[in-house]
Amino acid sequence: MPKKITHTILIFSQAMELGGVERSLLGLLDSIDYDRYDVDLFLMRHSGELMPYLNPKANLLPEIPQYASLAVPMASLLKSGQIGVLCGRLNGKLAARRFDKQHPGSKLSVTALTYSHKYTLSAMPQISDKTYDLAISFLTPHYFARERVKAKKYAAWIHTDYAALSFDRAAELAMWSRYDAICGVSEQASRSFQTAFPELSDKIQTVENILPRELTAKQAEQPQTDMPSDGAVKILSVGRFCDAKNFDNVPDICRRLMENGLDVKWYLIGYGGEEPLIRQKIAEAGMQERVIILGKKDNPYPYMRACDLYVQPSRYEGKAVTVREAQLLGKPVVITDYATSGSQLEDGVDGVIVPMDNAGCAAGIAALLRDPARMQQLSESCAKRDYTNSAEVEKIYALMED
């Protein structure tokens, strides 16, 4: 049967490294009706372990050197002749330092990331010569998709909790204002953004992350040998080793569980700049045999299937894809009470929300582990629910009809 293409879409993102945002992009690409919609995907870098899982029905546009060069050492830009990008990155780095120095605080600053795109925009070529019905910028910063793609409508995604960030409000307001629709991945992520930018309220809506059910279930069936069944309760956390995920506090929480008389092993899957800090905390807590860093895994799902409890101890989230993936696989889940936790799960029904402080977190986990019937109830509740959110793609289609 011939295609009846009604609209064209361009989706812009950065790469396909292991991460929740990237997996939700896979879910989105798998949910689109390619008989009705023509989709071009532009990635700044054709890199990452998830590249092989891109839906082949989406047309992957060629990599463009200027965009890819944002991720390489600055010294190599001089050798490759990327002078415009080099100057932009240098200017952005210096400007971000000035801004952060003038606006000190305890929140995580995203100014350097924002400026790395803002100050290199002038060096970036057009991404495509087409005019699309919709251009989606899937991951912030959102300068390039808006200014280097021709489209009738533009939409930008929010994957984080803006209340937890330090940012240049004037620069971001100007950036976000250029979009027709601003899509948060959870109700609370949308509300947090609306609090930060009330003047953009009429553009904000919620489009939940879409998860690829068949791929997740298929990958979960593969074998793993890193989490043996040795009598200990197997706890798992998956995510980047960064401040947001709070893995640096896992060793102390695990120590408290042990002191509570529980035989547990806590496995961490991921990678990132905070790994040395996490290893230091493991040593300080004496948890070398109990907190085990498994590192980067192309496929975390066999480990999710093998664990007894999935824990997301984050300081902040937009909406954690890994939590939904664990629930999709029928696992009992514990999350900390970060600002958007209420939109992540239904407390006591398909997961448990515990305090973020180490003592409270440990106490909440211990109470659950000592109640097998409750653990089973959580698993059964998860099995009855649809965590793929595949119907959310209709909201994206609607953006082109407004």
Regions found by a protein language model. Give the residues of each.
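A short hydrophobic beta-strand element within the catalytic core of glycosyltransferases
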Residues: 310-311
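A short, well-ordered alpha-helix in the C-terminal region of glycosyltransferases
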Residues: 360, 374-389, 395-398
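Aromatic "clamp/platform" in nucleotide-sugar-dependent glycosyltransferases that forms part
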Residues: 296, 315
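Short hydrophobic beta-strand element within catalytic cores of glycosyltransferases
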Residues: 332-336
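Conserved acidic donor-binding segment of nucleotide-sugar-dependent glycosyltransferases
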Residues: 347-348, 352-359, 367-372
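Donor nucleotide-sugar binding/catalytic pocket of nucleotide-sugar-dependent glycosyltransferases
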Residues: 155-159, 163, 177-219
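A conserved mid-protein helix/loop that constitutes part of the nucleotide-sugar donor-binding site
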Residues: 22-27, 233, 237-256, 262, ...
